[in-house]
A protein has these predicted regions:
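Acidic/histidine-enriched, beta-strand-rich ligand/metal-binding domains
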Residues: 2-95
Length: 95
C-alpha cells in the first residue's frame, strides 16, 4: 500500500491543474475539480484514480458538502454514468 504522503505527491505531480482535498472517508483518499475543464478526479484508497469528464460545478459543490463522500460519488457520479478515465497506482518495487 502506498503511503499517504507519497500518494498525495503523486497526485499533485501528475495532475498539476488540480488542488486535491483530502477527506476522512473509508474509501476516498482525495478529490479535486477543475472548473475550466469540468473534470473531477477521485483518488480512492488502494490506488485507483478516476478522472470523470463533463462534471458540472454543482456536482463538485455537492461533493464538498456531502457527509459521506463515497456515497455521494456513487450516487451522483458513478450511477449517473459520467464518462471517465481510470488510472491505477502501484507500489514501486524495491531493487
Amino acid at each position: 500500500m502506498i503511503k499517504d504522503e507519497a500518494y498525495l505527491d503523486l497526485l499533485s505531480e501528475n495532475f498539476v491543474d488540480f488542488d486535491f482535498e483530502r477527506c476522512s472517508s473509508s474509501n476516498v483518499f482525495a478529490y479535486a475539480y477543475n472548473e475550466k475543464t469540468n473534470v473531477l478526479i477521485v483518488a480512492f484508497k488502494g490506488g485507483k484514480i478516476y478522472q470523470y469528464l463533463r462534471v458540472k460545478p454543482s456536482i463538485y459543490h455537492g461533493l464538498q458538502k456531502a457527509e459521506s463522500k463515497g456515497k455521494f460519488i456513487n450516487s451522483q457520479v458513478i450511477q449517473k454514468g459520467f464518462k471517465y478515465r481510470k488510472y491505477e497506482v502501484q507500489e514501486p518495487e524495491n531493487k
